[in-house]
A protein has these predicted regions:
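Short glycine-enriched nucleophile-adjacent loop
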Residues: 175-184
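Structural recognition of the beta-strand scaffold that forms the well-ordered cores
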Residues: 71-75, 118-121, 165-166, 196-199, ...
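Bacterial Sec-dependent N-terminal signal peptides
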Residues: 1-22
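Gly/Ala-rich beta-loop-alpha elbow adjacent to hydrolase catalytic centers
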Residues: 168-172, 176
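Surface cap/lid and interfacial helix-loop subdomains adjacent to catalytic sites
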Residues: 18-19, 148-160, 184-328, 332-336
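Flexible, membrane-associating and regulatory peripheral segments of lipid-active enzymes
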Residues: 17-100, 104
Length: 336
């Protein structure tokens, strides 16, 4: 079997206009090559090849957590920030390398040793697509179709009866939510195999029929979601109590702020886990607010929006909870 707490990168980059950007009508774009998921080249992470999802942080190499018969279908966030096309070329080596060295290495790898990790290459939309409700939505449909096709191929050729977890971030979460509403919720036999979903970095309402938000550290057949901001900060986009948030430190949806002592550490850009017990988190109006305890060079890392660090800030908490949450079924089966 087989994050990059890049807190020094200004998080607003994810939403800012970059040059070049697509300015033409979507219909004028030359159609991109459709991914062929029969080949490993179209999987940025796959159990049959070595990739960055197989790497543990440098100071966590003695980690002994292990599970089997679990698959994680991981949908990566936007890594297409510069370009003049609405959808990324699946053979763009620069974009694929960036995806591999960022989100696969610092997000998908949280499941290393605990699951088979499948992450498809797809014709992701340009970040500017989120600012264009016309062309962006059309480009989104192209990207989503790749995800749905990849998931169906995975089901038919790779799953082999394993338990399924869907994990995503940012643009990936938008596609994952649509995968639920358009496909999974229409196929009960498949939905029953999806034991957990990480819908991170985008607002997700608590209204996914038959698949609720998790509200307990050991809940399964539910989804986890959060968007991380500095305590007291309100973004200009969506926030409300109707948006589902699970605190990734105490794994509760509501209640008091998590204890500093419960925080296991942050995954930094140098690929090391550092500064355990350094933050407290609390759910507030559809947001996850964090407060940092003092640690060396803390001021350098302080931002209002921690979007790109949604996994990194809680990397070890996510990993340990995933193990505890998913081993429950194994223990139940041994008891029966």
């Amino acid at each position: 079997m087989k994050k990059l707490l890049c807190l020094t990168l200004v998080s607003s980059l994810l939403w800012s206009c970059v040059s070049p950007i697509p300015i033409h009508r979507f219909e004028e774009e030359i159609p991109k090559l459709v991914p062929d998921y029969t080949t490993l080249d179209q999987w940025i992470a796959h159990p049959l090849k070595f990739d960055n999802s197989d790497l543990l942080p440098k100071n966590l190499l003695e980690d002994t957590l292990c599970l089997d018969s679990i698959d994680v279908f991981f949908i990566h966030p936007t890594t297409y920030l510069k370009g003049d096309q609405w959808n990324a070329d699946i053979n763009n080596k620069k974009i694929n390398r960036k995806t591999h060295n960022s989100t696969i290495k610092f997000q998908a790898n949280v499941f290393c040793g605990l699951a088979n990790i499948y992450a498809p290459v797809y014709r992701q939309i340009h970040i500017h697509g989120y600012k264009d409700n016309n062309n962006g939505l059309k480009a989104f449909d192209v990207a989503y179709k790749d995800i749905e096709n990849a998931f169906k191929y995975y089901l038919n050729h790779f799953n082999n009866g394993n338990r399924i977890v869907i994990a995503a971030h940012s643009q990936g979460t938008n596609h994952a939510e649509k995968l639920f509403t358009d496909f999974l919720l229409e196929n009960d036999s498949i939905l029953q195999k999806v034991e957990l979903a990480y819908l991170i970095g985008m607002p997700v309402h608590s209204l996914i029929k038959d698949y609720p938000a998790c509200d307990d550290p050991l809940d399964r057949h539910c989804f986890l979601s959060w968007r991380t901001f500095s305590h007291g900060f309100y973004p200009s986009y969506k926030y409300s109590d109707k948006i589902a948030v699970t605190n990734p430190v105490n794994w509760r949806r509501n209640g008091a702020a998590s204890l500093y002592n419960s925080h296991e550490g942050i995954l930094f850009r140098n690929f090391k886990i550092k500064h355990p017990k350094s933050l407290s988190a609390v759910v507030h109006q559809g947001l996850l607010w964090v407060t940092f305890e003092s640690f060396p060079m803390q001021k350098i890392f302080e931002k209002n929006d921690y979007h790109i660090a949604d996994y990194n800030l809680f990397w070890l908490n996510i990993r340990q909870n995933f193990y505890e949450r998913m081993k429950v079924k194994v223990e139940d089966e041994k008891t029966n």
